[in-house]
């Protein structure tokens, strides 16, 4: 297919652009295979470049011969184009709808993007499982790398290389994979160097109504226990949902077969419940005419902060088991690709200072989201505005980022990255020039040859010029475990995501700049003080002689 076939009218003059916090701009609208571009006729610097893949929905309106297209973006922005001529307007709308809903992944922009910057580091090779294993192997010899999934035949949603107990061989892993949903046998997610406890993750066991068991599975997870110690099985589904799963061949670990493990059920919502929650929240945030009662009522009715609370509570529970109880943890829901990853990731941010650095957080996303098989292509296919909903779309990753922001807000000096870093990750998960978030798992990315044909997001982010934008000026390395509050009054709406297009951030930006300047000035003064102290010490030494 040629993009030209979908572009009926490639250029229209005298188009007026309306967008939040900008004055209206009149200019020339151009459509390319991947971008909608509007250039001002008065000011050459005034330009809008919008990826078609960032468009969630469009509305059309006509008054006489003047047409209006309202574009609703996946990053929650809403822009308006006033186009002279009904035919031109209909053609532009038709082209945008076609170009923003391309079926083939290989037609997406990352396959056509050619970076204008020098690649200092290839992000595709920055965070490999072998590197993570090396980090842990200095503290323990009880684990090994397994390449059993090197051709993705055991588990299509796992990477080729995983970390498993050394006492369990690959033949046993095959049997365990057959006993777990999607072949997702328990693998190491995190090793707590302080006491040797671990977090493992998997899919649900396929016990069914007959209570099927797998002795190799029991041996595998028992291999993580110390003598006389119990472990915790955290199921991210309610007991009722887990019991219903047995009728479909799924289920949960039977106490009789896992006597050393205590099972805890939490209730983290999935799929359409989360999607509906996002739709209600964005709708409430976009409505400018609410009185206080109506606004608070709509915010509460969205249940967004309730989902945040449930996820953070479960992550804190997992971290508590590891650090305070001295017990290992296995976490799963149904597939083990959504709520499971939210919990394992957030538990590591609580426990592990490395995950609160920029590179450590990037490694966490690679390891616990991309390599762990979170289906980004499906979950982020649409955002809050699209009417043609599919059952697999859900803001799982956005909820995770929101949870991280809640912790960052409570511990503003413990994170090397800032809020802009989290917002950037949200934007690129939904629409990007980079290939990092394409595909649903490593198997699909391998077939698409993303490493050879697209650029990694990390290659761009980790350049010194870009990193400075995402660095927290308040950061001071904190090697302690951090315990966020999950009390309702401690959780807030993330304005930087949900209100950034409905109210100006000008004064907040100015205050942030002023804070950065004060911190820099303070560092300069501290450096001068240190020099003067050294000089004073030298003079005192000379006088003593």
From Swiss-Prot:
Residue span(s) of domain Myotubularin phosphatase: 123-498
Quaternary structure, from the entry: Homodimer. Heterodimer (via C-terminus) with lipid phosphatase MTMR6 (via C-terminus). Heterodimer (via coiled coil domain) with lipid phosphatase MTMR7 (via C-terminus).
Domain GRAM: 4-99
Organism: Mus musculus
A single BP term in Gene Ontology: endocytosis
Positions of post-translational N-acetylmethionine modification: 1
Cellular component GO terms held in the UniProt record: cytosol; endoplasmic reticulum; perinuclear region of cytoplasm; protein-containing complex; ruffle membrane
Name this protein carries in UniProt: Myotubularin-related protein 9
Intracellular or extracellular location(s): Cytoplasm; Cell projection, Ruffle membrane; Cytoplasm, Perinuclear region; Endoplasmic reticulum
The UniProt record lists the keyword Cell wall biogenesis/degradation: no
Keywords for this protein: Acetylation, Cell membrane, Cell projection, Coiled coil, Cytoplasm, Endocytosis, Endoplasmic reticulum, Membrane
Biological role stated in the UniProt entry: Acts as an adapter for myotubularin-related phosphatases. Increases lipid phosphatase MTMR6 catalytic activity, specifically towards phosphatidylinositol 3,5-bisphosphate, and MTMR6 binding affinity for phosphorylated phosphatidylinositols. Positively regulates lipid phosphatase MTMR7 catalytic activity. The formation of the MTMR6-MTMR9 complex, stabilizes both MTMR6 and MTMR9 protein levels. Plays a role in the late stages of macropinocytosis possibly by regulating MTMR6-mediated dephosphorylation of phosphatidylinositol 3-phosphate in membrane ruffles.
SUPFAM superfamilies: (Phosphotyrosine protein) phosphatases II (SSF52799), PH domain-like (SSF50729)
Topology in the lipid bilayer: Peripheral membrane protein
Cited InterPro entries: Myotubularin, Myotubularin-like_Pase_dom, PH-like_dom_sf, Prot-tyrosine_phosphatase-like
Family note: Belongs to the protein-tyrosine phosphatase family. Non-receptor class myotubularin subfamily.
An annotated Gene Ontology molecular function: enzyme regulator activity
Coiled coil: 508-542
Domain remarks: The GRAM domain is required for cell membrane localization. The coiled coil domain mediates interaction with MTMR9.
């Amino acid at each position: 297919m040629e993009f030209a076939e979908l572009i009926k009218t490639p250029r229209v003059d005298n188009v007026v652009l309306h967008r939040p916090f900008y004055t209206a701009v009149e200019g020339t609208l151009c459509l390319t295979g991947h971008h909608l571009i509007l250039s001002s006729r008065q000011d050459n610097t005034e330009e809008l470049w919008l990826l078609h893949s960032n468009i969630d929905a469009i509305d059309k309106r006509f008054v006489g011969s003047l047409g209006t297209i309202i574009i609703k973006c996946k990053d929650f922005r809403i822009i308006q184009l006033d186009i002279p001529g009904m035919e031109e307007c209909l053609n532009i709308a038709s082209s945008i709808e076609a170009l923003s809903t391309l079926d083939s992944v290989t037609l997406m922009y990352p396959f056509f993007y050619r970076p204008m910057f020098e690649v200092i580091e290839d992000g595709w090779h920055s965070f490999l499982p072998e590197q993570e294993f090396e980090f842990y192997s200095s503290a323990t010899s009880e684990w090994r790398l397994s390449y059993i999934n090197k051709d993705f035949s055991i588990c299509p949603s796992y990477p080729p290389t995983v970390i498993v107990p050394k006492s369990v061989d690959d033949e046993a892993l095959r049997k365990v994979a057959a006993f777990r949903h999607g072949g997702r046998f328990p693998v190491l997610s995190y090793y707590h160097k302080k006491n040797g406890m671990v977090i493992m993750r998997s899919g649900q066991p396929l016990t069914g109504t007959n209570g099927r068991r797998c002795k190799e599975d029991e041996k595998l997870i028992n291999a993580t226990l110390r003598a006389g110690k119990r472990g915790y099985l955290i199921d991210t589904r309610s007991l009722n949902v887990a019991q219903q799963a047995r009728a479909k061949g799924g289920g949960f670990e039977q106490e009789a077969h896992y006597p050393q493990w205590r099972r805890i059920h939490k209730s983290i919502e999935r799929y359409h419940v989360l999607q509906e929650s996002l739709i209600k929240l964005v709708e409430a945030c976009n409505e400018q005419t609410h009185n206080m009662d109506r606004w608070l009522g709509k915010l509460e009715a969205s249940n967004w902060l309730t989902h945040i609370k449930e996820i953070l509570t479960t992550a804190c529970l997992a971290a508590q088991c590891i650090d305070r109880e001295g017990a290992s943890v296995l976490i799963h829901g149904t597939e083990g690709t959504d709520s499971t990853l939210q919990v394992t990731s957030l538990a590591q941010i609580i426990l592990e200072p490395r995950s609160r650095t920029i590179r450590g957080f990037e490694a966490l996303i690679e390891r616990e989201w991309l390599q762990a098989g979170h289906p980004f292509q499906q979950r982020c296919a649409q955002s809050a505005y699209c009417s043609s909903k599919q059952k697999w779309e859900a803001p799982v990753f956005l909820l995770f980022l929101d949870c991280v922001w809640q912790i960052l807000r409570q511990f503003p000096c413990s994170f090397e990255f800032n809020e802009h870093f989290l917002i950037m990750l949200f934007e690129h998960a939904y629409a990007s020039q980079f290939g990092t978030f394409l595909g649903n798992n490593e198997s699909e990315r391998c077939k698409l040859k993303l490493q050879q044909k697209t650029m990694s997001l990390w290659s761009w982010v980790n350049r010194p010029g870009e990193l400075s934008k995402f660095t927290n000026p308040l950061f001071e390395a904190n090697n302690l475990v951090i315990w966020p509050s999950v009390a309702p009054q401690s959780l807030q709406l993330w304005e930087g995501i949900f209100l950034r297009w409905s109210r100006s951030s000008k004064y907040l930006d100015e205050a942030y700049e002023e804070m950065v300047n004060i911190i820099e000035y303070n560092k300069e003064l501290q450096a001068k003080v240190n020099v003067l102290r050294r000089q004073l010490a030298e003079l005192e030494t000379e006088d003593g002689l």
